[in-house]
Each structure stands twice: as structure tokens, then as C-alpha cells.
């Protein structure tokens, strides 16, 4: 689960900012000059374009060949005949720019050969799985960071204009796959197989490469998230919701994005964070037991369900179904997200395999530790409000319970105003208004104001749980005073809160891979309490209540002894304006350009690319993906 987004980005010369509403770029032909200044002229303010095509050589060149026109620097024509130039994707070969360093495919090997032309390429097991990579990695693999790879790529080009963000990320992922293969952690031939799929993007695509094969592989391999060292390694040099900042003009990438998420171990956890880590599985169990259907329960009648085989790592618990690893955006490879719950089937290799043109529902789970009260404390106002809620089960009792703490999780703001960024859930319903509610005017960006208007009509669903049955060791939902099992409240997600921004980033990443499957995001709020002495050490089985919901869930769903006793589950749909995705994409390209130029300007003179020490083992060539 991602950490929350921080405050708006601090002012700084190198922070890239652009308006949220972006006009389309003017089309530029292949002969157009680059828009940005010389590489050592900082800061950069525009996105670079491909260099003009290099002069044509007098020798005949097969136009269908994907090999570089010129050999890498310091590589002479005396190379042996069996050392082929490194094969590139069609898009990369068409783009201009110098070739990459002379990077061996394996220790003692030669240049990376075209996977399609290598007769010794091993046959890949048709049942290979992305989830077989162990959680712990050897130190030499942990050293294969994106920053180190990027610096190695710069040693092999004559100008940073030759390297684009998407190509750089795909080249890194491909090289990492080969390293994993050499270490025996994935099937032989998998690295080349993934690159063959990646370079077969549709010719009409902007980058003419297909990022999903590589990026989907790593998403499937990192579903254990924080318990997986590969997950931590991939997040290094990747901008996530916790490191992306939001200013008045939209998303701001930190100048230090390449250094972000550098720690392979989680920071020291606060009690609130630990409460969330322990009880996120609780919320997941409740969600799948009562509210959300599983995507692995089978398809519609007549559908080819063999394609949609539910697949999870063998060490994932039942309550962790539909969890996601780190998925990188398919536009620039600069942004990553690890969704808590994505209701999407997977294929036999572990890849996300949504039904075409079907909405993708995903859920971001937040466990509110500030409601974790001691029910045995008679002086606690929250405990008293809880007793009243269990006795009456009315909307009035629920609102009183939510307001029983100093900073309630639902914040009221008057119509015509905008909410502050303090709470993730807000409402304009007069029933939630309090006598001491603040009527102050707040400043708000036009984009946030538009998102408030877009979400103001959303209604949340609230599921209430009764006290545990100590005789039968069960917990079940209870009906409200109206007789309904689900209460609909006019409460919506606050676009100014970090939780909303996190969901926005997740939607952007999903949309980049599945544009024909509109994302349907939700914010799930779990409220639970501490246990009484009689409840300590007891595992409670989840059962249906009176008027049970129709969604079938796993029969073995339960609440473990270390988890909180559930009180309520609030499910809030979230509406996102896809126009914001353009701002994220533009800002990510600008941030990459600025960082690349800084690395270029600060590089030290060294040997040519053929002798330079690099970490890449990729069977690609270094060309711009733009």
C-alpha cells in the first residue's frame, strides 16, 4: 500500500511545472531540430525531440534491418563475423541518435544477438510464471538500479537527446530480466522472449514498442509488495504517489526523483502505519466476502474462461487475492503504482488479463487507526458512541460515532465552498453539519475545484458489523434501523487529500496499459476497534447476516487474533478527469529531460563506450523512444 502524498512541492528552479490543461503539441517532422537547448545548458524547459536522421552512408543498407547504421564508438570494422550488431525494436531503429555502448549479453558473451535470429536460443517452457522469483535477491542483483543503468547508457551516446524515458526504462527492465535469468531465478530464454514481445508494438504507435510484456512481467513478479526485494528495487528511481507533489498548476516531479525510494527496507513504522499493515487484510477479507465479486469465479456463459485463469503467488494468503505488484506507466516509464486491489483476472503466466472493453474496478484501502478505541474504557467517548451505534444502528448514531473523535474522518463543508485537504472523506449534506463547523473560505486550484464538482454527487456505501459472537466465534454484518444491510451516505472522496491523488496516479498507470478498459476506482475506509479481554486470541469466522449480500466470497474468510474487530466498511467511488493524465505525462518527460541533462553535464571523462563499465545486459540498442 502506497504511503500518502506529501504537501505541494517546494519552490525550486529545477521543479518542472505545467498547467493541467495541455494543448496538443504541434506535429514535428523527423527533420525538425530539437526544441531544447544544448545538453549542458540548464535548466531545460521543453521536451526534447528526436535528432535529425544521420547522413546516409555510401554502402547499401537493408531498409528492413534493425541494426545501427554505424558501429558503436571504439568498435571497428574488424569485428568478427559472428558478432552481430545489437538488434533494436523497429521504433528504436527508425529514431535517430548514436548507438549504445558495447554491452555484453552475458559474462564472456558477445554483443546481444537478435533473439529471432539466434539458433541457440532455448525453448521457453510454455507454462512459465512471473511469480516464481523469490522475495530475497542476491546483492549483485540489488545493485542493478535504474540510476546505475541510466548512467551506463549515457556513456554510450554522443548527446542525451538520444535517450528517451520509455526506452530507458524498457532497456533497464530487459537487462534486469537477463540478469535474473543468469542467476537461475527465471526460465532460460525468458529475457529474450520478453524483448521479442516488447519490440513488436504496432507500427502506428507513438513509440512503436509494446511496454506491457516487460512491465506486466514485473508487476506479476512483485505482488508481495513490501515483502519482495524486487518490488523495492524497481521502485528505486520511480516516481510513486508518495513522492509526486501537487502544486497549483498540477503535478510536480521532484528534482531528486532518481534518488527516491532508495531504501530496500521500510522505514520505522508508526503505530498508525502498523495498524494499517495488520488490518489491510481484514478490510480485503470483508470486501471480497460481502461486497466485491472475484474475477476468478468464472466468466459469462459461453465465454472462453481458459484464458482467464486466476493466478497468484503460492505464498499469498487467501485474503490477498487480486493484489498487485508495481506497475509502471506505459507512456514514459517514470511513474509507478502498486494497487491494493485490482479486480482483474490473470492469465497462466500471471499477467493481468482484463476482458476487453470491461471496466477495471480497483480499491485503495485505508485503515483509520484513530478509531481504534478500547471498548472496555467507560470514559472513552468513542466507546460510548460505539455502544449507542450497536444499540440503534441508525444514521444519526453512525454520524455521532464518526464525530466522537477530535478529528473525524468525514469533514463537512458548505455548498459553494471547497474542502480543506485534512480529511479523505467530505460531505455537503446538512445532516453532517455541526454548530462549530468552520465556514472559512479556502483557496483552491481550478483543477481541484473541478474535481470537487465532479465528485460531489457520489454516494458512499456503508456496511455495519455487529459485536462478535463469542459462542460461535463468528462476526457478521448487521442491518441498519431501516432494515437495509447497506446504508447509502452522501459522502465522497476529497480531491484535495493525498488519498485522492494516490488514486489518480493509479488510474493514470492503469489507463496507460488498458485504455479500452475504463478504470473504476474506489476508496475503502476500514474502521475497527481493539478487542476485549474475552475476544483476545480468538479467530472469528465471517458469516452472512440477515438479508445477506449476494456477492459470494471465500468460505474460509476470517478475522485473525492480531486483527481488529470490524465496525464499519465505507466504500466510496471516485471520479477522475482523464485530462489530468496529460499533465502527469508531460511533467514526467520534463523531469526526465532535466535529470538526464544534469547527469550529462556532470559526467567525468572516461573510456569510450566499448570499454565503459556498465550494468546493462539488454538486447536492445540505445535510441530515443520518441
UniProtKB/Swiss-Prot annotation:
Subunit structure: Forms a complex with the DNA polymerase, the DNA polymerase processivity factor, and the major DNA binding protein. Interacts with the host MRN complex composed of MRE11, RAD50 and NBN; these interactions may help in recombination or repair of the viral DNA. Interacts with host MSH6, a component of the post-replicative DNA mismatch repair system (MMR).
Biased segments, Low complexity type: 609-626
Domain of life of the native organism: Viruses
Composition skew (Basic and acidic residues), residue ranges: 73-86
Alphabetical keyword list: Endonuclease, Exonuclease, Host cytoplasm, Host mitochondrion, Host nucleus, Host-virus interaction, Hydrolase, Nuclease
Keyword Membrane recorded: no
GO CC annotations, alphabetized: host cell mitochondrion; host cell nucleus
Subcellular location: Host nucleus; Host cytoplasm
Bilayer-crossing regions: none
Gene Ontology terms, MF aspect: DNA binding; endonuclease activity; exonuclease activity; nuclease activity
Principal place of residence: host cell
Broad EC category: hydrolase
Location of region: Disordered: 1-127, 601-626
EC number(s) from the headed UniProt entry: 3.1.-.-
Site (described: Required for function): 280, 340, 364, 366
Bias (Polar residues): 59-68
Protein name, entry field: Alkaline nuclease
Its job: Plays a role in processing non linear or branched viral DNA intermediates in order to promote the production of mature packaged unit-length linear progeny viral DNA molecules. Exhibits endonuclease and exonuclease activities and accepts both double-stranded and single-stranded DNA as substrate. Exonuclease digestion of DNA is in the 5'-> 3' direction and the products are 5'-monophosphate nucleosides. Additionally, forms a recombinase with the major DNA-binding protein, which displays strand exchange activity.
Family: Belongs to the herpesviridae alkaline nuclease family.
Amino acid at each position: 500500500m502506497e504511503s500518502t502524498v506529501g504537501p505541494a512541492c517546494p519552490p525550486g528552479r529545477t521543479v518542472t511545472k505545467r498547467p493541467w490543461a495541455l494543448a496538443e503539441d504541434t506535429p514535428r517532422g523527423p527533420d525538425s531540430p530539437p526544441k531544447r537547448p544544448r545538453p549542458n545548458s540548464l535548466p531545460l524547459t521543453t521536451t526534447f525531440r528526436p535528432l535529425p536522421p544521420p547522413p546516409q552512408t555510401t554502402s547499401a543498407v537493408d531498409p528492413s534491418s534493425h541494426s545501427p547504421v554505424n558501429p558503436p564508438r571504439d568498435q571497428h570494422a574488424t569485428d568478427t563475423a559472428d558478432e552481430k550488431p545489437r538488434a533494436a525494436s523497429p521504433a528504436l531503429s527508425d529514431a535517430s541518435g548514436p548507438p549504445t555502448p558495447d554491452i555484453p549479453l552475458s559474462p564472456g558473451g558477445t554483443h546481444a544477438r537478435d533473439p529471432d535470429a539466434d539458433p541457440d536460443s532455448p525453448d521457453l517452457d510454455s507454462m512459465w510464471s512471473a511469480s516464481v522469483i523469490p522475495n530475497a535477491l542476491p546483492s549483485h542483483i540489488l545493485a542493478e538500479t535504474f540510476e546505475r543503468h541510466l548512467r551506463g547508457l549515457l556513456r554510450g551516446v554522443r548527446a542525451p537527446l538520444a535517450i528517451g524515458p520509455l526506452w530507458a526504462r524498457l532497456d533497464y527492465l530487459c537487462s534486469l530480466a537477463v540478469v535474473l535469468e543468469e542467476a537461475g531465478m527465471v526460465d532460460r530464454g525468458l529475457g529474450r522472449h520478453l524483448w521479442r514481445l516488447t519490440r513488436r508494438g504496432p507500427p502506428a504507435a507513438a513509440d512503436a514498442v509494446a511496454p506491457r510484456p516487460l512491465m506486466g512481467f514485473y508487476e506479476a513478479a512483485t505482488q508481495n509488495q513490501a515483502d519482495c526485494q524486487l518490488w523495492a528495487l524497481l521502485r528505486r528511481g520511480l516516481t510513486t504517489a508518495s513522492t509526486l507533489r501537487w502544486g497549483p498548476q498540477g503535478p510536480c516531479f521532484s528534482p531528486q526523483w532518481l534518488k527516491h525510494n532508495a531504501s530496500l527496507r521500510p522505514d520505522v513504522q508508526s503505530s498508525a502505519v502498523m495498524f494499517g499493515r495488520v488490518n489491510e487484510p481484514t478490510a480485503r477479507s470483508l470486501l471480497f466476502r460481502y461486497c466485491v465479486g472475484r474475477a476468478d469465479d468464472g466468466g459469462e456463459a459461453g465465454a472462453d474462461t481458459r484464458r482467464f485463469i486466476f493466478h497468484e503467488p503460492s505464498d499469498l494468503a487467501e485474503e490477498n487475492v487480486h493484489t498487485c505488484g508495481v506497475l509502471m506507466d506505459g507512456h514514459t516509464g517514470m511513474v509507478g503504482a502498486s494497487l491494493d486491489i485490482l479486480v482483474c483476472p490473470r492469465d497462466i503466466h500471471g499477467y493481468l488479463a482484463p476482458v476487453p472493453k470491461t471496466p477495471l474496478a480497483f480499491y485503495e484501502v485505508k485503515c483509520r487507526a484513530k478509531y481504534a478505541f478500547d471498548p472496555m474504557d467507560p470514559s472513552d467517548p468513542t466507546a460510548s458512541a460505539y455502544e449507542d451505534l450497536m444499540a440503534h444502528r441508525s444514521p444519526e448514531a453512525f454520524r455521532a460515532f464518526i464525530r466522537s473523535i477530535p478529528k473525524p474522518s468525514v469533514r463537512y463543508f458548505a455548498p459553494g465552498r471547497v474542502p480543506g485537504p485534512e480529511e479523505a472523506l467530505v460531505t455537503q449534506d446538512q445532516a453532517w453539519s455541526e454548530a462549530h463547523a468552520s465556514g472559512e473560505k479556502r483557496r483552491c486550484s481550478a483543477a481541484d475545484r473541478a474535481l470537487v464538482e465532479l465528485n460531489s454527487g457520489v454516494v458512499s456505501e456503508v456496511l455495519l458489523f455487529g459485536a462478535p459472537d463469542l459462542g460461535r466465534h463468528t462476526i457478521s454484518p448487521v442491518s441498519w434501523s431501516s432494515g437495509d444491510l447497506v446504508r447509502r451516505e452522501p459522502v465522497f472522496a476529497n480531491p484535495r487529500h493525498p488519498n485522492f491523488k494516490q488514486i489518480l496516479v493509479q488510474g493514470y498507470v492503469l489507463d496507460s496499459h488498458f485504455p479500452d478498459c475504463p478504470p473504476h476506482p474506489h476508496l475503502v475506509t476500514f474502521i475497527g476497534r481493539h478487542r476485549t479481554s474475552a475476544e483476545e486470541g480468538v479467530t472469528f469466522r465471517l458469516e452472512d447476516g440477515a438479508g445477506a449480500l449476494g456477492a459470494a466470497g471465500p468460505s474460509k474468510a476470517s478475522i485473525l487474533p492480531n486483527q481488529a474487530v470490524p465496525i464499519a466498511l465505507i466504500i466510496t467511488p471516485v471520479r477522475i478527469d482523464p485530462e489530468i493524465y496529460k499533465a502527469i505525462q508531460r511533467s514526467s518527460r520534463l523531469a526526465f529531460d532535466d535529470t538526464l541533462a544534469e547527469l550529462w553535464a556532470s559526467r567525468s571523462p572516461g573510456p569510450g563506450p566499448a570499454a565503459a563499465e556498465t550494468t546493462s545486459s539488454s538486447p536492445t540498442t540505445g535510441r530515443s523512444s520518441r
